[in-house]
Amino acid sequence: MQFIDRITIKVTAGTGGHGKSAFRREKFVAKGGPSGGDGGRGGDVIFRVDNNMNTLLDFRYHRKFTAKNGENGDIKNQYGHNAPPCIVKVPQGTLVKDADTGEILADLTELGQEAVIAKGGRGGRGNAKFANSANRAPTFAEFGEPGEVKNLLLELKLQIGRASCRERV
């Protein structure tokens, strides 16, 4: 079995869903107000320590991790769903660094420990959020914000076990 203790990967968090620009339409309501819903939040990229892994060999051929995007808003003030996070399993003792700046983002030493490495984008607001006393029927909505994109350097720290030896007399 080959042992890999340092590798570079790329993670991309999800983009937020777009807000909707829509208006209320009913049979006997001539001028319905704005009814566009907000977009959902993009998925985060989370690193989780897994007991079943002991090397970074799994990342050798799978170097890009992308979270899903949030859903767009819809008519009748319906919000878009938030995207689920992308869980990346790493071995115990993994040090996560930003490959561009060298900043340490996380030191994952305990089993089950989690760290949010890349945050997902915020969802855009629908036109119902922009209605006020001066503009009661806005025709615009916001786009969702993009998620974070990071190049990471994963390093596996050496774990030394203590063994006691007795001398024979």
Locate the predicted segments by residue.
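Conserved small/polar residues in nucleotide/adenosyl-binding loops
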Residues: 163-169
